[in-house]
């Protein structure tokens, strides 16, 4: 199969969409769940050795295939078997469009499948970091992007995408955004504070995954420079075991074990309560795009300390209140956290309102996801039915 079924387009505005990506990503689940709720037939193509955690929307189908074994050296036999298996899965699903989320591996799979039309949605590190790691990664990025029928980016990715080989006419701008009706300012949950023993303590919430990319170790080092009433909360969900163990050992060595709270699991529906519990939200990765975490924190009106990266500056550069710090700088991070923690309540409230207004104006998920949906119709040369006629 070398072509998709777009040629069979008719009056029906229900699309058949297949996705390659991490089936356990809350953001990808949000994306595919939205499309399924709009009446489209959505299928996740998942490697056989990949465990799909509970919570994938019931309206999203799962089709398994045997992916090639990614690593420093990829066996040609593995590539051939993976390509054949994915092509068979696509033949069973017969999508109008194949959308790979994340250039590395998932995008490569889309390219190797030979299926068209396919879309690559870039996430951040897959375009900012991975293509620079080896000549093979750079070559695969170029081949995948040049052959793609559309490449979805956020604005700060444009130059990196072009440098990696994406044709400019294929670039389209998207933002997942934040659900501003769900992520709102509100009172702190007394039950949540009591559950984690946080009475009388100030909370720094660091919601990114515990992996080397997100530099949670920097947050722990910064914590050692903050007053003893300050604690840091991090989610265990999707943590890399080695990195989690390293961070816990470092916290113990610094005498901070009782001030580092690793939360076992946070359901997406409960995230607003954790943001509201936070006196400050911190996000200091090495690389980032238009972080949904950042947008959710702003939508909840929380003070924010973030890495000074182009994608972050795009949203926060002109906004008074959020603190931007260099990558891998615990001292600067600690100083920024201290300033944010010491904000007077009236200043905190005013700046929180401004931050939320930015998200409501520019990243309301109801609009951003609808805009993303319209790009699929654009690619197929089809016009969706008017709202309300579905």
Cite the ranges covered by each PLM segment.
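Glycosyltransferase donor-sugar binding loop
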Residues: 50, 178, 231-248
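N-terminal subdomain of nucleotide-sugar transferases
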Residues: 1-58, 224, 366, 384-390
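Short alpha-helical donor nucleotide-sugar binding micro-motif in glycosyltransferases
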Residues: 90, 265-266, 273-278
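Aromatic "clamp/platform" in nucleotide-sugar-dependent glycosyltransferases that forms part
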Residues: 286
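Short hydrophobic beta-strand element within catalytic cores of glycosyltransferases
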Residues: 303-306, 313
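Conserved donor-binding/catalytic core segment of Leloir-type glycosyltransferases
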Residues: 151, 197-214, 220-227, 233
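Nucleotide-activated donor-binding/catalytic signature segment of Leloir-type glycosyltransferases, i.e.
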Residues: 245-265
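Conserved acidic donor-binding segment of nucleotide-sugar-dependent glycosyltransferases
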Residues: 318-331, 339-345
């Amino acid at each position: 199969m070398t072509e998709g079924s777009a040629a069979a387009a008719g009056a029906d505005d229900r699309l058949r969409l297949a996705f390659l990506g991490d089936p356990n990503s809350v953001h990808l689940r949000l994306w595919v769940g939205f499309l399924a709720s709009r009446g489209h037939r959505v299928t996740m193509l998942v490697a056989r050795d990949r465990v799909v955690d509970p919570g994938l929307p019931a309206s999203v189908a799962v089709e398994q295939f045997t992916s090639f074994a990614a690593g420093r050296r990829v066996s040609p036999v593995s590539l051939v078997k993976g390509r054949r298996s994915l092509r068979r899965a696509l033949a069973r699903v017969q999508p109008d469009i194949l959308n790979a989320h994340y250039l590395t591996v998932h995008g490569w799979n889309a390219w190797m499948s030979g299926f068209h039309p396919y879309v690559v949605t870039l996430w951040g590190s897959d375009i900012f970091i991975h293509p620079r790691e080896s000549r093979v990664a750079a070559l695969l990025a170029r081949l995948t992007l040049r052959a793609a029928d559309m490449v979805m980016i956020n604005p700060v990715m444009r130059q990196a995408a072009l440098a990696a080989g994406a044709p400019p006419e294929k670039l389209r701008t998207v933002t997942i955004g934040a659900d501003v009706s769900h992520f709102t300012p509100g009172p702190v949950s007394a039950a949540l504070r009591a559950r984690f023993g946080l009475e009388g303590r100030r909370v720094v919430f660091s919601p990114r995954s515990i992996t080397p990319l997100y530099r949670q170790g920097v947050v722990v080092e910064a914590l050692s420079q903050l007053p003893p009433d300050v604690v840091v909360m991090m989610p265990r969900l999707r943590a890399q075991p080695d990195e989690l163990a390293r961070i816990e050992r470092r916290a113990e060595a610094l005498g901070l074990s009782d001030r580092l709270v690793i939360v076992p699991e946070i359901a997406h529906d409960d995230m607003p309560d954790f943001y509201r519990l936070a006196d400050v939200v911190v996000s200091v990765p090495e690389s980032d795009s238009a972080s949904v975490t950042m947008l959710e924190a702003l939508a909840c009106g929380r003070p924010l300390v973030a890495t000074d990266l182009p994608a972050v500056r795009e949203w926060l550069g002109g906004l008074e209140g959020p603190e931007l710090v260099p990558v891998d700088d615990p001292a600067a991070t600690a100083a920024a956290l201290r300033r944010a923690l010491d904000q007077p309540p009236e200043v905190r409230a005013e700046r929180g309102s401004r931050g939320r207004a930015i998200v409501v104006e520019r990243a309301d998920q109801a609009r951003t996801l609808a805009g993303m949906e319209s790009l699929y119709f654009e690619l197929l040369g089809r016009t969706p039915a008017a709202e309300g006629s579905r």
